[in-house]
């Protein structure tokens, strides 16, 4: 039976992946495409988010949408934050969209010199290599940095990821560098940044929309639901009987992010992206802020 996967044009001709480049001055931010009309903000909800920013001494951005009712909650949802390791879920989606099941099981070889810090899975498989399927699992579920770079390399580097996101309607996210440089999160630098609204859009397209073939959606959803790094963020702020699939990210300047699809019992899914930052380069991340913000958002959505 013929494979019915849609392989986008960006995936058919992958340019050679460039080496990580040294920091350069900020580029101009890409234009933000207009989205659907937003739910009018609730002053009480905005006040609660503002209070959380003060409590945690951090900048908070959040976007959540009930895919059943269309109701949304937004707070600084169109401001830029460094996306950090959340990109790994999007890169995995791009890999899925550009491969057949047989190609997913092809072994990717890499050297010890390519290993990065925070590579708990790939560090144990240098001698044997790993399949693309295994690398996606390692990147999404364990936030393995080496796996993340290998996925980027497969789709044509940051430029290839940008093209894949543009194909699903994201003209906001700017993918520019590789792990670990993409985590620098210097205020005002638009490289490797996105917005809560844009990341929520991407995740919705890949997990709930038709951007991926059905079997690819199922794979990505499974990896997100079995993520091992998200227990203290969005998952901690929603009812225990909700199913959550998420991808976290952390960077300098206290950057801490989580993008998730939430499945409440007997309701349509909720898609949520929470992004945070602080003023000092070595500031600690505040996981509890993301959990508290998620709690406020789901309460507001009812």
Swiss-Prot record:
Any one Gene Ontology MF annotation carried by this entry is: beta-lactamase activity
Q: Which InterPro entries match?
A: Beta-lactam/transpept-like, Beta-lactam_cat, Beta-lactam_class-A, Beta-lactam_class-A_AS
Entry's PROSITE patterns?
Answer: BETA_LACTAMASE_A (PS00146)
GO CC, any one term: extracellular region
| Location(s), subcellular | Secreted
Q: Where is this region: Disordered?
A: 1-43
Q: Which domain of life is it from?
A: Bacteria
Which positions make up the signal peptide? 1-29
Q: What is its main location?
A: secreted
Family, according to the entry, reads as follows: Belongs to the class-A beta-lactamase family.
Give the protein name, as stated in the record: Beta-lactamase
Q: Which organism is it from?
A: Amycolatopsis lactamdurans
**Taxonomy-wise, where does this protein's organism fall, top ranks first?**
Bacteria, Bacillati, Actinomycetota, Actinomycetes, Pseudonocardiales
